């Protein structure tokens, strides 16, 4: 069977508004049939808190603490909870809902993408597993943080979450993006989450470090981001017969960026909930 051609993008380091604008621009141009399915890698400057689409900003985030720590703040197009993007490799995948990797709904598509991500990480020596889903029961206090518990088909190591992802579907196109954590920074994340008391904050921060991890801790060594990306690309190729062609943003995508970046930078978008 001939390999399917995908575009491989590495857009490097950008500010939070640009990063989210690029993901949406890729989605919109793919919806119009102007671009192939795309795997993108990127990074963030400054380190940034990204909110899930449905989160309530003023209820969950201490804006003064965000400012004091010099963090960026942006609301994602995807759902889920707050993520601190710091020392990580961020990926996104855009393809149509009827693509073989995406058919069947959210959970099956999560699983297919997780298999490729996990295979790439295993090539590095990480003994990762794919979580089957959330455990039952209620916590004493549910935080707004994404990495405090694994969700459906997310990647764990020894039961601790290593990769967190979120997905949205718009106009027949799927956007999934996620964070492959290199070193965990719970201190900054929990400093900006609103808590009922400092005692609760410290208790949940300790729990967070018990339930999440970074790749450097798992491997006992530092792996360069480029090596991680190469392994993930090879895993997609091996599992799903995808041929990746390195490329850049199209003129159509670039043409959308100014307006989309302004949307993500606007207070109305950030405070929409």
From Swiss-Prot:
Query: What pathway or pathways are given for this protein in its record?
Result: Protein modification; protein lipoylation via endogenous pathway; protein N(6)-(lipoyl)lysine from octanoyl-[acyl-carrier-protein]
Keyword Acyltransferase among record annotations: yes
SUPFAM superfamilies reported in the protein's UniProt record: Class II aaRS and biotin synthetases (SSF55681)
Span-the-membrane segments of this chain are: none
Q: Which organism is it from?
A: Moorella thermoacetica (strain ATCC 39073 / JCM 9320)
Pfam families hit by this protein: LplA-B_cat
> Site (Lowers pKa of active site Cys): which residue positions?
161
Per the entry, what this protein does is:
Catalyzes the transfer of endogenously produced octanoic acid from octanoyl-acyl-carrier-protein onto the lipoyl domain of GcvH, an intermediate carrier during protein lipoylation.
Record domain BPL/LPL catalytic: where: 33-244
Which residues does UniProt call coiled coil?
none
Keyword set, alphabetical order: Acyltransferase, Transferase
What HAMAP family has UniProt attached to this entry? Answer: LipM (MF_02118)
Residue positions of the active site: 146 (acyl-thioester intermediate)
Q: Further notes on this entry? A: In the reaction, the free carboxyl group of octanoic acid is attached via an amide linkage to the epsilon-amino group of a specific lysine residue of lipoyl domains of lipoate-dependent enzymes. The reaction proceeds via an octanoyl-thioester enzyme intermediate.
Give the first-level EC class, as a single word: transferase
**Protein known as:** Octanoyltransferase LipM
- UniProt superkingdom: Bacteria
Catalysed reactions listed for this entry: octanoyl-[ACP] + L-lysyl-[protein] = N(6)-octanoyl-L-lysyl-[protein] + holo-[ACP] + H(+)
In the Enzyme Commission scheme, what number(s) does this protein have?
Answer: 2.3.1.181
What quaternary structure, including any partners, is listed in this protein's UniProt entry?
Monomer.
Q: Give the family per the record.
A: Belongs to the octanoyltransferase LipM family.
An example GO biological process term is:
protein modification process
Q: Which InterPro entries match?
A: aa-tRNA-synth_II/BPL/LPL, BPL_LPL_catalytic, LipM, Octanoyltrans_LipM/LipL
